Amino acid sequence: MDIRRIVLYMALALIGLSLWNAWQIDYPAAQPVEDKTASQLTSDGHLLPQIIPSNAEQPVTLKAEEKASSGKQLIQVKTDVLDVGIDLKNGDIVKGLLLDYPLSVEDKNKPFPLLQNQASQRYVANSSLFVLDGQTPQSLDFDFTSEKEYYELKPDQNQLIVTLNGKSEDGLDVKKEFVFTKGSYLIEVNYKIANTGNSLWKGYFNTQLLRSSPKEDKSSIFHIGSYTGASFSNPGKNRYQKVSFSDMSKSNLDVDAKGGWIAMQQHYFLSAWVPNADSENKFYTLATDKDYTIGAVSQPITVKPKEDKIVGSKLYIGPEITSVLKGISPSLDLTVDYGILWFLSSLLFSLMKAIYTVVGNWGWSIVLVTVLIKLAFYRLSATSYKSMASMRKLQPKLQALRERYGDDKAKISQATMELYKQEKVNPLGGCLPILIQIPVFIALYWVLLESVELRQAPFIFWINDLASADPYHVLPLIMGATMLIQQKLNPAPADPMQAKVMMFLPILFTGLFWNFPSGLVLYWIVNNTLSILQQWYITRKYSDEKPAKKVVATAK
């Protein structure tokens, strides 16, 4: 099999995958009917899981609260990086704006809304306490109050604590604290429980991330989509496990974990609840007709009369920055989803970042990383191009064999192999060097696709966002031209039909890259350009060696 066939098969596989993804979007699989015995939606919008209390043989289903939800009252908390809205009904975070990340290049003054509670799109971070009343679980309603409606972290402050005060009907005084830190997207959420009653209190601490189904991008059947869905980490068992929305619709997750984390992911951004490393929790997922939830429920919490207890968790609302996520919890950085080659992608990103600290431009960083990769594989590429040059020189002899034996494929094949042996040409010599490089190219591809640092990062001229498509589509056209030049340098395929297909590939890939992020297209342009120069140089050098020797021999 020669390199042309490999390229052709890879292109067809990529097209098939894109068409399949488009089909799945337009004709999704039928969703099973939700099992209402597994979960219930409370009147305040919380989904509560199925649990097994210590004194029960069968699971207990939490049922909806009978008390109607009161009108919403939000308090606003603003730091240097976050603008958060907290609903006083249950102390849920229902708004989360990322101040350092504009919505788009055109809307620089509008921060990106990671969390929101709109009718069309809901994505909130809930936390609550609930109890078991016999065999009937109930979510506690504290109707929190706060001293102010607006809190702001001052420039000279390193920390801001927002306290909500509430009281339950059974004599529980609760202070719900939110601790914000300067320059951080991590929020500490603590319940300070004081049992002012005369009997033992026993309950559970519940955290969850709830969002409605995201809208699919149908702008192109070749649209590249990053993973959007839930995930979790169960230390010692699953470092990083995805739970897609379709998985939630089919069955509910039920995992016992010590430490770990739960998360909702989307392209570039992440929300995650991170329990204490020594706490034991049950991770679960639930799905309704509109909403998907991943949550964590603690082991039973007991507070004796006249005693206090603190329970809590940490909530991350922010960008998927590898170095930041590593410091929060083990394996949380894996949500920067580089795929199966994550270890190689991590090395390449570290190299890109090191170059960026010097040049100060992510576009030039992409260019220089591509150059370094080409230099690292120079000898392998040279072997491949030398093999191609040898094959090109054999084309007249191969054509003569085809004309001599006509339709006798067996004789053509035998004569071709004898010719290869006689000329000391390995027809597979151009394939192996290319195959060795493919993992590196794939790893860099995912670095360019997943790194939030490239979001709205400018390059030069009209390219003001390396994570978005070229608005004038100049880069895809240049990329297509480089592919066409590369094909002209390669030996022509023996099969006329294959030759026509190969000539069509530059047009096909131009359309494929039409809406690709500019950073990805830039990488392919630089890579193709360097390949053209290297192939031209090696082919020219190799082709001129033997004629030069013949001239010298004749002169003698």
UniProtKB/Swiss-Prot annotation:
The gene is yidC. The keyword Chaperone applies. Coiled coil: none annotated. It is a multi-pass membrane protein. Interacts with the Sec translocase complex via SecD. Specifically interacts with transmembrane segments of nascent integral membrane proteins during membrane integration. It comes from Legionella pneumophila (strain Corby). InterPro entries: Membr_insert_YidC, Membr_insert_YidC_N, YidC/ALB3/OXA1/COX18, YidC/Oxa/ALB_C, YidC_ALB_C, YidC_periplasmic_sf. One of its GO terms (cellular component) is plasma membrane. It is found in: Cell inner membrane. One of its GO terms (biological process) is protein insertion into membrane. Keywords: Cell inner membrane, Cell membrane, Chaperone, Membrane, Protein transport, Transmembrane, Transmembrane helix, Transport. One of its GO terms (molecular function) is membrane insertase activity. PANTHER family: CYTOCHROME C OXIDASE ASSEMBLY PROTEIN COX18, MITOCHONDRIAL, OXA1. The chain crosses the membrane at residues 6-26, 332-352, 358-378, 428-448, 501-521. Belongs to the OXA1/ALB3/YidC family. Type 1 subfamily. This is Membrane protein insertase YidC. Required for the insertion and/or proper folding and/or complex formation of integral membrane proteins into the membrane. Involved in integration of membrane proteins that insert both dependently and independently of the Sec translocase complex, as well as at least some lipoproteins. Aids folding of multispanning membrane proteins. HAMAP family: YidC_type1. Pfam families: 60KD_IMP (PF02096), YidC_periplas (PF14849).
